[in-house]
Amino acid sequence: METILQHVPVGQKVGIAFSGGLDTSAALRWMKNKGALPYAYTANLGQPDEEDYDAIPRKAMEYGAEKARLIDCRPQLANEGIAAIQSGAFHISTGGITYFNTTPLGRAVTGTMLVAAMKEDDVNIWGDGSTFKGNDIERFYRYGLLTNPALKIYKPWLDQAFIDELGGRAEMSAFMTKEGFGYKMSAEKAYSTDSNMLGATHEAKDLEHLNSGIRIVNPIMGVAFWKPEVEVKAEEVSITFDEGRPVAVNGREIADPVEMFLELNRIGGRHGLGMSDQIENRIIEAKSRGIYEAPGMALLHIAYERLVTGIHNEDTIEQYRINGLRLGRLLYQGRWFDPQAIMLRETAQRWVARAVTGTVTLELRRGNDYSILNTESPNLTYAPERLSMEKVEDAPFSPADRIGQLTMRNLDLMDTRDKLAIYSKAGLLSLGTANALPQLDGGKK
């Protein structure tokens, strides 16, 4: 059964994820002229660079949409962002600086909520602006078909007729002007930007070259902290969690998760917190490069992980991080709602997050420079008296106890010596004149 349509479905309803930009505007009008019945759906994801959401559906109607709807996706996006924090669903990092999978989270919400809205209007064909080289074409495909098994996909950017007529932005602008809309292209930037309430992605064009970097980016969620003329004052902030959910900032309770992220974005953004430069593997295994912003996610992540390390034992933390790496990849691949992802996420939310209650106080400076000033929780297993270097009453263990514990180590030490001897006889290790222990033999064997 054909799922992807390569030609305009004449006379049929076609839902388009409509941003109001040149690409989707030209695509909507072009489909209308070719005989399709375009329905426009716009996701309100709280994009920091979007000034007037209500104007977008009106614009779609002007361009020929049969119907245009604005879908408020912010509450769902905020909750998915918190779920990602709780489960540590992040697999891409460089030098300890994390990418918080904000675009994959946005696609999970957009792909499900827009297709659900289309089903309400009996629209079973969906198009969006993703290209064949990127991740989004697969993410939207998966989420769309999960939500509506009867869904067909029509993307003008996969239709050769559309490409031949409107293959570039100059052609699209000329087409819209000819149609009487006087659409002018916005000034070309040195890179492209995609954003939602959780974070922003800057990529492509000049940023495809690794000798261009963060210094050419104009942040939309924070400040250009690398510029010496940008003043950034140190600031203290406290974040409170209750059973894994953020509930207060600086002592002020915030029940609405959307408002929580907006407040954290404001605070973190004043410092440029959460910006990172990453080289990553796309779903198709080719490498790409992006520069990311996520001030609110970064604040939550730092505070949450501080409580995790103070509350849980080493084995739990290890499993949380291993599962988080795997879950981050699944999220990146468009599998956030697949059973294997739900299993990993639910495990972390139930057995890790539910114990995470407390308050962490930070001092934020420039960029990702911060200090942890205080950690408070009724669930802390950190107890300074257990390992105090001072003499304490009722010590949890004595020198004699430690002697016994060390003596027990002799068992595995004997086994280790025997194994090293076996490897030496096999030629895998050699005894050097300056070494008391066997060394790897330079990879010769």
From Swiss-Prot:
Enzyme class (EC, first level): ligase
Pathway recorded for this protein: Amino-acid biosynthesis; L-arginine biosynthesis; L-arginine from L-ornithine and carbamoyl phosphate: step 2/3
Binding site for ATP: 17-25, 43, 129, 131, 136, 194
Family: Belongs to the argininosuccinate synthase family. Type 2 subfamily.
Gene that this polypeptide is encoded by: argG
CDD domains the UniProt entry points to: ASS
Localisation per UniProt entry: Cytoplasm
Residues noted as binding L-aspartate in the record, renumbered to the chain: 131, 135-136
Identification of the protein by name: Argininosuccinate synthase
E.C. designation(s): 6.3.4.5
The organism of origin for this protein: Ralstonia pickettii (strain 12J)
Catalyzed reaction equations: L-citrulline + L-aspartate + ATP = 2-(N(omega)-L-arginino)succinate + AMP + diphosphate + H(+)
Classification lineage: Bacteria, Pseudomonadati, Pseudomonadota, Betaproteobacteria, Burkholderiales
Principal subcellular localization: cytoplasm
One GO BP annotation of this record: urea cycle
Binding residues annotated for L-citrulline, in chain numbering: 99, 135, 139, 192, 201, 203, 280
Quaternary structure, from the entry: Homotetramer.
Keyword set, alphabetical order: Amino-acid biosynthesis, Arginine biosynthesis, ATP-binding, Cytoplasm, Ligase, Nucleotide-binding
Molecular function in Gene Ontology: argininosuccinate synthase activity; ATP binding; protein homodimerization activity
GO CC field: cytoplasm
